[in-house]
Amino acid sequence: MNLEALCKEAGLSFYDDELVSENGRKIYRIYVQKEGGVNLDDCARLSEILSPIFDVEPPVNGEYFLEVSSPGLERKLSKIEHFAKSIGELVKITTNEKEKFEAKIIAVDDENITLENLENKEKTTINFNDIKKARTFVEW
C-alpha cells in the first residue's frame, strides 16, 4: 500500500504517520498537508478512501481507530524532508547530547540543518542524525 499515492489521489500530500495509545485505545494517525491548508472535508475524503483499503490490508495489527489530520502549525519534524519543507520557520530542537536550540531553519541539505539563533543571530549547523526531537513553533 502506498500512502503517498493514496493521499495524492485525495489532493493531499502525505506528511507522516504514527501509532499511539491513548486511554487504552490504539490510534493510527495519518498527517497530511495541502497548499492553503487542510480542512475537515479533506480529512474525511481521505478517510473514506483509506477505510475500505485498510479493511482488507490493515496498517497495524489488532483493533485500532483511524485519524486523518493536519500536522498543525506546531508540528513534529522527524524526517529531513520535514526540515526542508520548513525553511524559514522557527524550531525547537533537542540533540542527542541534550543541547537545546530555539532558532530559525535557514538551510537544509541531505544530512545537515543550518539554524539561525533567535537571540544573537549566530548560525549553527547540526547533523540530522544528532537530533533527538524537533518541533516547529509559532511566536505569538
Swiss-Prot record:
Disulfide bonds: none
Lineage top rank: taxon: Bacteria
Annotated compartments: Cytoplasm
Swiss-Prot/TrEMBL keywords: Cytoplasm, Ribosome biogenesis
GO cellular component, one term: cytosol
InterPro entries, alphabetized: Ribosome_maturation_RimP, RimP_C, RimP_C_sf, RimP_N, RimP_N_sf
Stored SUPFAM superfamilies: YhbC-like, C-terminal domain, YhbC-like, N-terminal domain
GO biological process, one term: ribosomal small subunit assembly
Presence of keyword Cytoplasm: yes
Primary subcellular site in the record, as a coarse category: cytoplasm
A Pfam family per the record: RimP_N
CDD domains tied to this protein: YlxS_C
PANTHER family found in the cross-reference section: RIBOSOME MATURATION FACTOR RIMP
UniProt function note: Required for maturation of 30S ribosomal subunits.
Family: Belongs to the RimP family.
Protein name listed in UniProt: Ribosome maturation factor RimP
